């Protein structure tokens, strides 16, 4: 092999072509400093390669895949460099020290197989006068010398150097064939060196791979934006529905509380019925003022008398179109005779106080012995004259003393629907046969006492049954018309002793 290379060099010298590789070798041999530096450089990758531990099989597989991918990436670059105007051939020649230090430095830094990236394309500066065959021979000689120059680091160079050496030892039949083989070897060496160099770049190559990853399309980004907007709209709709539900709930609760408050206020005003809340009515205001003063004049009376009497007469005065007159029965025992007469008279006058006139007064005890029909006629005349003349109230004392037949006239004045005067008040008094009347007696018992007394007085089996006489049925009809309110009266000592001061 060496003899063939020497003969090729001799032929190249004879043909007038300059051998840059030989010149660079002569310079290296003559300079001892360069030789020592070359020896140091040769030892360094050996030691580094020996000291470096073997990588795991999985790591080697991953590196192999990465190198394959990156080599495929740079294949296009290598193909483009094979054009006739290849820039690698136009670079200035390199000396032997640079050729030997380039792979050794790469082995030291990267820990991989050295390659002849710089030796393949940068070391040859061909003379344009040389023939194609001379170029092929010089390329083969240069590749063999590069592979032989560092025998100690050949174990680490791997398959790339072996391929190059075997390629350099190819048949040399014909100068044209060797030239084409040399060009193919140069291109292959350049491609392998680029692939190995890129495989050793580490993080930079990973960044380039990341850049080659597919970037999300704008359509997917728009779809994600639309999904986010839809979710936001759904959340806003949920919040609005929640707010509406809360508003309806709170509104219903507030409305219910308002209705309850109005109802309670109405009930309270109905049962309390204070005088100042009553609409303005001159007759009513005058009655309330006079009736309020009676509590001081007649002490010791039950609260039932004042409350029920005031409400009953107030309701009648407040009615715009009353359907019947207001009829009240006051009753007392024998010890309260004067108090009964005086109290009933003041109540009737209080009712008609707005007209500035007194009430009509009839005493049944004075007409007890008279004819029933006569008394009936007289009572009718007095009541009709008084009501027609503006007297809005009448008092009939000792109603139980009137002749039984004469009391039938009160059908006319106390009827529920067909009363002769509906906007008036009739106050009747009944004196019980009992000497005293307990204050603890209930209103119901008082009403029964009065009813029993009238039945005993007005119904008599010996009296004839005629139109002008009283019977049980007629008395029942009369009782239903006059017994709307029965109130007991307790005696007042001053009035019983001194009489009623009208």
Swiss-Prot record:
Native organism taxonomy: Eukaryota, Metazoa, Chordata, Craniata, Vertebrata
Cellular compartments annotated: Endoplasmic reticulum membrane; Nucleus envelope
Annotated protein name in UniProt: Torsin-1A-interacting protein 2
Protein purpose: Required for endoplasmic reticulum integrity. Regulates the distribution of TOR1A between the endoplasmic reticulum and the nuclear envelope as well as induces TOR1A, TOR1B and TOR3A ATPase activity.
Segments traversing the membrane: 247-267
Subunit field text: Interacts with TOR1A and TOR1B (ATP-bound).
Xref: InterPro entries: LAP1C-like_C_sf, TOIP1/2, TOIP1/2_C, TOIP1/2_N
One Pfam family per UniProt: LAP1_C
Bias kind Polar residues: ranges: 1-14, 23-58, 192-207
Coiled-coil parts of chain: none
PTM sites of type Phosphothreonine: 225
Gene3D superfamilies: 3.40.50.12190
Residue numbers carrying Phosphoserine: 24, 104, 131, 195
Ranges where the record places region Interaction with TOR1A: 268-502
Biased composition regions of type Basic and acidic residues, renumbered to the chain: 59-99, 109-120, 154-165
